[in-house]
């Protein structure tokens, strides 16, 4: 792909690709830590599109991973090149814990269901070996660990590690093993996975904490925070008043509604101004003092449901 390619062009192509392959897509949010959200059945994607995948920093990546875990979404970077070379097709790269692939690789996954097998890492390109298949076929050929190791020009210990899932193989070694055994032994990489929760901070936050919600504050998103129901795991995208005027709140309601529809989450404004109606452009409004009178997260969600249709 030409180095002069514009990010906007790649982003538009990815958006069109998703829409034409059965995904419900959000608007594009270029000033956010993520560019768009897309859903197809149970698969929810949180995408960042870059020309140079090294352009993402650790803080942006952390926020993307946090949101992905909260929404049970798969974070992914689609990029054209790194700072040193173009991204290769059907190879998975990684930046700050987020998988990164070339547009062609992403297209293969979305349109054709073909997933990459090769991982780019320090020192070269690697694959995951199907250890069970490797052991079964080796034994069918009556080959010992040492026999197969000698044929593949690796150590007996290396073959043992492959069979027990203790090591990745270089792409070259995997190819040699497949030629020897006449069978595919490499595994496709599932990059549509949800990040682990061990690094995610869900902070108790005032009145919401009292009724069973944790709050995840965001810094570079089209919304202010995400409230996570601790007991039942429901998610609510939240905008706070922050002394914003009615016109600004109406403008902010558009991405709130858009993202809540795609993510399957609830959305709400939490504000102090008593003059604001109970609904802004289809988004329910709850006053801060009302939360103090609620007894549970269920009551909070019930009020949201009731106020969706308020005029």
From Swiss-Prot:
Disulfide bonds: none annotated. CDD domains: HTH_XRE (cd00093). The keyword Phosphoprotein does not apply. InterPro entries: Arc_TR_HTH, Cro/C1-type_HTH, Lambda_DNA-bd_dom_sf. Residues 145-164 bind DNA. SMART domains: HTH_XRE. Residues 134-192 form the HTH cro/C1-type domain. Keywords: DNA-binding, Transcription, Transcription regulation. The keyword Transcription applies. One of its GO terms (molecular function) is DNA-binding transcription factor activity. It comes from the Archaea. It holds the Pfam family HTH_3. This is Putative HTH-type transcriptional regulatory protein MTH_967. It comes from Methanothermobacter thermautotrophicus (strain ATCC 29096 / DSM 1053 / JCM 10044 / NBRC 100330 / Delta H) (Methanobacterium thermoautotrophicum).
């Amino acid at each position: 792909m030409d180095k002069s390619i514009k990010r906007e062009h790649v982003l538009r192509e990815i958006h069109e690709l998703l829409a034409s392959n059965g995904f419900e897509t959000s608007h594009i949010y270029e000033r956010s830590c993520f560019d768009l959200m897309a859903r197809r059945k149970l698969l929810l994607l949180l995408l960042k599109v870059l020309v140079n995948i090294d352009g993402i920093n650790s803080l942006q990546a952390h926020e993307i991973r946090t949101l992905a875990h909260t929404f049970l979404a798969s974070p992914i970077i689609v990029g054209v090149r790194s700072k040193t070379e173009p991204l290769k097709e059907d190879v998975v790269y990684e930046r700050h814990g987020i998988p990164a692939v070339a547009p062609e690789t992403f297209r293969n996954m979305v349109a054709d269901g073909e997933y990459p097998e090769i991982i780019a890492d320090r020192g070269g390109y690697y694959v995951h070996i199907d250890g069970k298949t490797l052991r079964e076929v080796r034994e069918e050929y009556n080959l010992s660990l040492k026999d197969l190791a000698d044929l593949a020009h690796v150590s007996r210990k290396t073959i043992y590690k492959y069979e027990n899932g203790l090591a990745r193989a270089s792409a070259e070694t995997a190819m040699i093993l497949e030629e020897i055994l006449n069978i595919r032994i490499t595994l496709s990489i599932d990059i549509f996975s949800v990040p682990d929760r061990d690094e995610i901070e869900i902070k108790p936050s005032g009145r919401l904490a009292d009724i069973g919600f944790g709050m995840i504050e965001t810094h570079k998103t089209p919304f202010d925070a995400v409230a996570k129901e601790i007991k039942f795991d429901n998610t609510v995208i939240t905008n706070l008043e922050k002394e914003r005027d009615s016109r600004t709140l109406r403008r902010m309601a558009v991405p709130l509604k858009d993202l809540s529809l795609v993510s399957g989450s609830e959305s709400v404004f939490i504000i102090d101004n008593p003059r604001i109606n109970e609904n802004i452009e289809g988004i329910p409004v709850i006053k801060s003092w009302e939360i103090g009178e609620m007894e549970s997260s269920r009551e909070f969600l019930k009020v949201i449901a009731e106020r969706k249709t308020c005029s």
